[in-house]
């Protein structure tokens, strides 16, 4: 099978002086990309390392195609960034691994995800979406656990994320 491999390399994303320590948390190392490529090749597949969404757009615009895309791309900008590659692949009717674009767009927004879970009556801990620099006024029991609203792969989470009264 011809498999395209999409990913975002750490080396292609440069932090600035205001970037958090976990800036690279969701991007792949060259070692990871090589390891996954090797594993797929060992299984008998022909693997094309495509890279990020910009490379995928070029790949597709040149008329190149694969049977399946192994998608690990994180996207780059905006709160629906993880859904960018799957959306493009859906438009080209190319199957891919992992979650679809709608699921990725919803789940990156933790507040929206919690709303959907509650509407579906799926048990989930109480939550509150807070704006920056606001006092915490809540009836939710302490300690609280805070997370960035639009991040994944544990970015922005440390022992400082626990708030005691």
Give each language-model segment a name:
Residues 47, 95-96, 124, 144:
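Hydrophobic beta-strand scaffold residues
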Residues 98-103:
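A short, structured active-site edge motif that brings together acidic residues
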């Amino acid at each position: 099978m011809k498999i395209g491999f999409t990913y975002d390399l750490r080396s292609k994303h440069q932090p600035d002086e205001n970037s958090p320590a976990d800036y690279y948390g969701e991007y792949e190392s060259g070692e990871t990309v090589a390891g996954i490529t090797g594993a797929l090749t060992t299984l008998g597949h022909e693997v094309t390392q495509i890279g990020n969404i910009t490379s995928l757009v070029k790949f597709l615009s040149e008329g190149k195609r694969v049977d399946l895309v192994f998608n690990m791309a994180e996207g780059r900008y905006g709160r629906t960034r993880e859904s960018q590659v799957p959306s493009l692949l859906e438009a080209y009717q190319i199957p891919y691994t992992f979650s679809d674009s709608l699921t990725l767009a919803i789940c990156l927004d933790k507040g929206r995800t919690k709303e959907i879970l509650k509407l579906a009556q799926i048990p989930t801990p109480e939550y509150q979406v807070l704006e920056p620099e606001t006092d915490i006024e809540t009836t939710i029991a302490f300690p609280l656990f805070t997370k960035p609203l639009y991040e994944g792969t544990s970015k922005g989470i440390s022992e400082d994320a626990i708030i005691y009264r």
